[in-house]
Amino acid sequence: MRAAGLVLAGGRSSRMGVPKAALEWHGSTLLRRTCGVLHRAGLHPVVVVRAPEQELPPLPADVEVVDDPREGLGPLQGMAVGLTALADRAEVAFVCSTDLPFLHAELVRRVLRPFGHPVDGDALDVVLPVARGYPQPLSAAYRTRLAPVVAALVAADRLRPAFIFEDATVLRLDDDALLTDAALRAADPTLESLVNVNERADYDAARARPAPEVTVECFGVLASRSGRGPRAARAATVGAAARAVDLVLDRHVLAAVNGDQTGRDGELPLMAGDTVAFLSADAGG
Protein backbone atom coordinates (compact mmCIF):
# COMPACT_ATOMS: atom_id res chain seq x y z
CA MET A 1 0.00 0.00 0.00
CA ARG A 2 1.38 3.37 -1.01
CA ALA A 3 0.82 5.92 1.75
CA ALA A 4 1.50 9.65 1.57
CA GLY A 5 1.42 12.53 4.01
CA LEU A 6 -0.79 15.59 3.55
CA VAL A 7 -0.30 18.66 5.74
CA LEU A 8 -2.87 21.45 5.66
CA ALA A 9 -0.99 24.68 6.33
CA GLY A 10 -3.37 27.26 4.89
CA GLY A 11 -5.63 27.87 7.88
CA ARG A 12 -6.18 31.44 9.01
CA SER A 13 -4.95 30.79 12.59
CA SER A 14 -7.34 33.49 13.79
CA ARG A 15 -7.29 32.38 17.42
CA MET A 16 -3.50 32.08 17.46
CA GLY A 17 -3.02 35.50 15.92
CA VAL A 18 -0.04 34.40 13.80
CA PRO A 19 0.37 31.62 11.21
CA LYS A 20 0.82 28.34 13.06
CA ALA A 21 3.03 26.84 10.36
CA ALA A 22 5.88 29.22 11.18
CA LEU A 23 5.68 29.00 14.97
CA GLU A 24 9.08 28.24 16.48
CA TRP A 25 9.56 24.76 17.88
CA HIS A 26 12.84 24.02 19.65
CA GLY A 27 14.93 25.70 16.97
CA SER A 28 12.73 24.51 14.11
CA THR A 29 9.08 25.23 13.24
CA LEU A 30 5.82 23.40 13.77
CA LEU A 31 5.43 22.81 10.03
CA ARG A 32 8.98 21.51 9.65
CA ARG A 33 8.44 19.14 12.57
CA THR A 34 5.15 17.84 11.19
CA CYS A 35 6.66 17.10 7.78
CA GLY A 36 9.62 15.38 9.42
CA VAL A 37 7.40 13.15 11.55
CA LEU A 38 5.47 12.04 8.47
CA HIS A 39 8.72 11.23 6.69
CA ARG A 40 9.87 9.25 9.70
CA ALA A 41 6.60 7.32 9.60
CA GLY A 42 7.58 6.16 6.11
CA LEU A 43 5.18 8.32 4.11
CA HIS A 44 6.09 9.47 0.61
CA PRO A 45 5.53 11.93 -0.79
CA VAL A 46 4.74 14.50 1.86
CA VAL A 47 2.64 17.32 0.42
CA VAL A 48 1.92 20.67 2.09
CA VAL A 49 -1.15 22.63 0.96
CA ARG A 50 -0.84 26.36 1.49
CA ALA A 51 -3.14 29.34 0.99
CA PRO A 52 -2.69 31.75 -1.93
CA GLU A 53 0.57 33.73 -1.56
CA GLN A 54 1.21 32.18 1.86
CA GLU A 55 4.86 32.23 2.90
CA LEU A 56 6.09 29.03 4.49
CA PRO A 57 9.15 28.42 6.64
CA PRO A 58 12.03 26.51 5.02
CA LEU A 59 11.25 22.87 4.25
CA PRO A 60 13.33 19.94 2.99
CA ALA A 61 13.68 19.71 -0.77
CA ASP A 62 11.63 16.52 -0.95
CA VAL A 63 8.54 18.12 0.60
CA GLU A 64 6.11 19.18 -2.11
CA VAL A 65 4.14 22.41 -1.78
CA VAL A 66 0.77 22.74 -3.50
CA ASP A 67 -1.09 26.03 -3.76
CA ASP A 68 -4.76 26.13 -2.84
CA PRO A 69 -6.32 28.72 -5.16
CA ARG A 70 -9.30 29.36 -2.88
CA GLU A 71 -8.84 30.85 0.56
CA GLY A 72 -11.17 30.81 3.52
CA LEU A 73 -13.14 27.63 2.80
CA GLY A 74 -11.63 25.60 5.61
CA PRO A 75 -9.83 22.27 5.71
CA LEU A 76 -12.08 20.46 3.21
CA GLN A 77 -10.91 22.74 0.41
CA GLY A 78 -7.29 22.01 1.29
CA MET A 79 -8.04 18.30 1.47
CA ALA A 80 -9.64 18.34 -1.97
CA VAL A 81 -6.55 20.00 -3.45
CA GLY A 82 -4.13 17.73 -1.63
CA LEU A 83 -5.92 14.42 -2.25
CA THR A 84 -6.19 15.31 -5.93
CA ALA A 85 -2.46 16.01 -6.07
CA LEU A 86 -1.76 12.59 -4.54
CA ALA A 87 -4.38 10.48 -6.30
CA ASP A 88 -2.03 8.98 -8.90
CA ARG A 89 0.81 8.34 -6.46
CA ALA A 90 -0.72 6.93 -3.29
CA GLU A 91 -3.77 4.95 -2.26
CA VAL A 92 -3.97 6.48 1.20
CA ALA A 93 -2.95 9.77 2.81
CA PHE A 94 -2.51 10.63 6.46
CA VAL A 95 -4.04 14.11 6.66
CA CYS A 96 -3.11 16.48 9.45
CA SER A 97 -2.86 20.11 10.43
CA THR A 98 0.33 21.88 11.47
CA ASP A 99 -0.67 22.39 15.10
CA LEU A 100 0.16 18.94 16.52
CA PRO A 101 3.42 19.60 18.37
CA PHE A 102 3.60 16.12 19.94
CA LEU A 103 2.60 14.06 16.92
CA HIS A 104 4.47 10.75 17.00
CA ALA A 105 5.30 8.54 14.04
CA GLU A 106 3.79 5.56 15.85
CA LEU A 107 0.39 7.26 15.91
CA VAL A 108 0.61 7.80 12.16
CA ARG A 109 1.52 4.14 11.60
CA ARG A 110 -1.29 2.98 13.89
CA VAL A 111 -3.91 4.97 11.99
CA LEU A 112 -2.69 3.70 8.62
CA ARG A 113 -2.37 0.06 9.62
CA PRO A 114 -6.03 -1.03 9.10
CA PHE A 115 -5.79 -0.21 5.39
CA GLY A 116 -3.32 -3.05 5.03
CA HIS A 117 -5.64 -5.67 6.52
CA PRO A 118 -5.98 -8.51 3.99
CA VAL A 119 -9.70 -9.05 4.63
CA ASP A 120 -11.42 -5.68 4.87
CA GLY A 121 -8.70 -3.08 4.35
CA ASP A 122 -9.69 -2.47 0.72
CA ALA A 123 -13.22 -1.53 1.76
CA LEU A 124 -12.13 1.20 4.16
CA ASP A 125 -12.33 4.83 3.10
CA VAL A 126 -11.32 6.52 6.35
CA VAL A 127 -9.61 5.61 9.61
CA LEU A 128 -10.67 8.20 12.18
CA PRO A 129 -9.14 8.53 15.65
CA VAL A 130 -11.63 9.49 18.35
CA ALA A 131 -9.56 10.82 21.23
CA ARG A 132 -11.19 11.41 24.61
CA GLY A 133 -14.55 11.14 22.87
CA TYR A 134 -13.78 13.70 20.15
CA PRO A 135 -13.31 12.79 16.47
CA GLN A 136 -9.98 13.93 15.02
CA PRO A 137 -10.57 14.44 11.28
CA LEU A 138 -7.29 16.34 10.92
CA SER A 139 -5.25 13.49 12.37
CA ALA A 140 -6.85 10.81 10.23
CA ALA A 141 -6.19 8.70 7.14
CA TYR A 142 -8.21 8.91 3.93
CA ARG A 143 -8.30 7.07 0.64
CA THR A 144 -7.08 9.42 -2.07
CA ARG A 145 -10.00 8.18 -4.18
CA LEU A 146 -12.16 10.41 -1.98
CA ALA A 147 -10.78 13.52 -3.73
CA PRO A 148 -13.85 14.04 -5.98
CA VAL A 149 -16.18 13.36 -3.04
CA VAL A 150 -14.48 16.06 -0.99
CA ALA A 151 -14.46 18.47 -3.94
CA ALA A 152 -18.20 17.93 -4.42
CA LEU A 153 -18.84 18.71 -0.76
CA VAL A 154 -16.92 21.97 -1.11
CA ALA A 155 -18.87 22.85 -4.25
CA ALA A 156 -22.10 22.24 -2.33
CA ASP A 157 -20.90 24.47 0.52
CA ARG A 158 -20.90 21.50 2.89
CA LEU A 159 -17.62 22.40 4.51
CA ARG A 160 -17.53 20.34 7.71
CA PRO A 161 -15.20 17.30 7.67
CA ALA A 162 -17.99 15.23 9.22
CA PHE A 163 -19.87 15.34 5.90
CA ILE A 164 -17.18 13.10 4.38
CA PHE A 165 -18.19 10.31 6.71
CA GLU A 166 -21.88 10.20 5.74
CA ASP A 167 -21.38 7.96 2.69
CA ALA A 168 -17.91 6.59 3.45
CA THR A 169 -16.79 3.40 5.14
CA VAL A 170 -15.20 4.69 8.32
CA LEU A 171 -13.28 2.83 11.00
CA ARG A 172 -13.35 4.81 14.23
CA LEU A 173 -10.55 4.15 16.71
CA ASP A 174 -11.14 5.33 20.27
CA ASP A 175 -8.38 5.63 22.85
CA ASP A 176 -8.52 1.97 23.83
CA ALA A 177 -8.49 0.80 20.22
CA LEU A 178 -5.55 3.04 19.35
CA LEU A 179 -3.57 1.78 22.32
CA THR A 180 -3.99 -1.89 21.44
CA ASP A 181 -0.92 -1.19 19.30
CA ALA A 182 2.08 -2.03 21.47
CA ALA A 183 4.44 0.37 19.73
CA LEU A 184 2.08 3.32 20.14
CA ARG A 185 1.29 2.34 23.72
CA ALA A 186 5.01 2.41 24.55
CA ALA A 187 5.76 5.63 22.66
CA ASP A 188 2.68 7.71 23.48
CA PRO A 189 0.55 6.10 26.21
CA THR A 190 -1.51 9.24 26.84
CA LEU A 191 -2.02 10.04 23.13
CA GLU A 192 -0.30 13.40 23.29
CA SER A 193 -0.01 13.03 19.51
CA LEU A 194 -3.59 14.25 19.23
CA VAL A 195 -3.14 17.41 21.33
CA ASN A 196 -3.37 20.53 19.19
CA VAL A 197 -2.62 24.17 19.90
CA ASN A 198 -5.33 26.62 18.88
CA GLU A 199 -4.56 29.65 21.02
CA ARG A 200 -1.40 31.39 22.14
CA ALA A 201 -1.73 30.01 25.66
CA ASP A 202 -1.91 26.47 24.25
CA TYR A 203 1.26 27.03 22.26
CA ASP A 204 3.11 28.66 25.15
CA ALA A 205 2.22 25.76 27.46
CA ALA A 206 3.32 23.19 24.87
CA ARG A 207 6.54 25.03 24.10
CA ALA A 208 7.37 25.22 27.82
CA ARG A 209 7.49 21.45 28.11
CA PRO A 210 10.95 19.89 28.03
CA ALA A 211 12.23 18.48 24.77
CA PRO A 212 11.87 14.69 24.38
CA GLU A 213 14.37 12.48 26.16
CA VAL A 214 16.54 10.56 23.72
CA THR A 215 19.69 8.45 23.86
CA VAL A 216 22.83 9.70 22.11
CA GLU A 217 25.81 7.58 21.13
CA CYS A 218 29.05 8.40 19.31
CA PHE A 219 31.20 5.94 17.39
CA GLY A 220 34.67 5.79 15.91
CA VAL A 221 36.82 8.88 16.16
CA LEU A 222 33.85 10.87 17.47
CA ALA A 223 33.72 8.68 20.56
CA SER A 224 37.20 9.76 21.57
CA ARG A 225 36.13 13.39 21.43
CA SER A 226 32.60 13.26 22.78
CA GLY A 227 32.51 9.95 24.63
CA ARG A 228 30.96 6.81 23.26
CA GLY A 229 28.01 6.86 25.60
CA PRO A 230 25.22 6.04 25.48
CA ARG A 231 23.98 9.08 27.32
CA ALA A 232 20.54 10.56 27.88
CA ALA A 233 19.77 13.99 26.48
CA ARG A 234 16.82 16.30 25.95
CA ALA A 235 16.68 17.04 22.24
CA ALA A 236 13.85 17.83 19.81
CA THR A 237 16.02 17.62 16.69
CA VAL A 238 19.09 15.77 15.45
CA GLY A 239 21.00 19.05 15.60
CA ALA A 240 20.11 19.51 19.25
CA ALA A 241 21.25 15.94 19.97
CA ALA A 242 24.59 16.73 18.34
CA ARG A 243 25.00 19.85 20.44
CA ALA A 244 24.21 17.84 23.57
CA VAL A 245 27.44 15.88 23.01
CA ASP A 246 29.42 18.91 21.79
CA LEU A 247 29.37 17.92 18.13
CA VAL A 248 28.94 20.15 15.10
CA LEU A 249 26.73 18.47 12.52
CA ASP A 250 28.91 19.30 9.52
CA ARG A 251 30.08 17.37 6.45
CA HIS A 252 32.39 15.26 8.61
CA VAL A 253 29.55 13.85 10.72
CA LEU A 254 26.70 11.50 9.84
CA ALA A 255 23.67 10.76 12.00
CA ALA A 256 21.42 7.73 12.32
CA VAL A 257 18.13 7.61 14.24
CA ASN A 258 17.08 4.19 15.51
CA GLY A 259 19.49 2.65 13.03
CA ASP A 260 18.25 4.57 9.99
CA GLN A 261 20.87 6.87 8.50
CA THR A 262 19.58 10.42 8.21
CA GLY A 263 22.61 12.27 6.86
CA ARG A 264 23.07 15.77 8.23
CA ASP A 265 19.52 17.08 8.57
CA GLY A 266 19.83 19.01 11.80
CA GLU A 267 16.10 19.83 11.90
CA LEU A 268 14.94 16.23 11.61
CA PRO A 269 12.53 15.86 14.54
CA LEU A 270 13.21 13.48 17.38
CA MET A 271 10.65 11.74 19.56
CA ALA A 272 10.80 10.32 23.04
CA GLY A 273 12.74 7.08 23.15
CA ASP A 274 14.78 7.67 20.00
CA THR A 275 18.41 6.61 19.84
CA VAL A 276 20.66 8.93 17.85
CA ALA A 277 24.05 7.69 16.71
CA PHE A 278 26.80 9.90 15.32
CA LEU A 279 29.72 8.61 13.30
CA SER A 280 32.51 10.08 11.24
CA ALA A 281 31.68 10.49 7.56
CA ASP A 282 35.40 10.48 6.73
CA ALA A 283 36.18 7.14 8.32
CA GLY A 284 32.78 5.45 8.00
CA GLY A 285 32.46 5.35 11.77
Regions found by a protein language model. Give the residues of each.
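Nucleotide and nucleotide-moiety/phosphate-recognizing core
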Residues: 1-138, 144-158, 167-191, 272, ...
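Acidic phosphotransfer microenvironment of two-component signaling modules
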Residues: 29, 201, 260
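The catalytic Nudix box helix
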Residues: 31, 198, 241
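Short, conserved phosphate/pyrophosphate- and ester-handling motifs at nucleotide-, phospho-/glycolipid
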Residues: 143, 199
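An accessory alpha-helical subdomain
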Residues: 160-162
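Conserved anion/nucleotide-ligand pocket segment
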Residues: 195
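Ubiquitin-like/PB1-type beta-grasp interaction modules and other compact soluble beta-rich domains
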Residues: 204-284
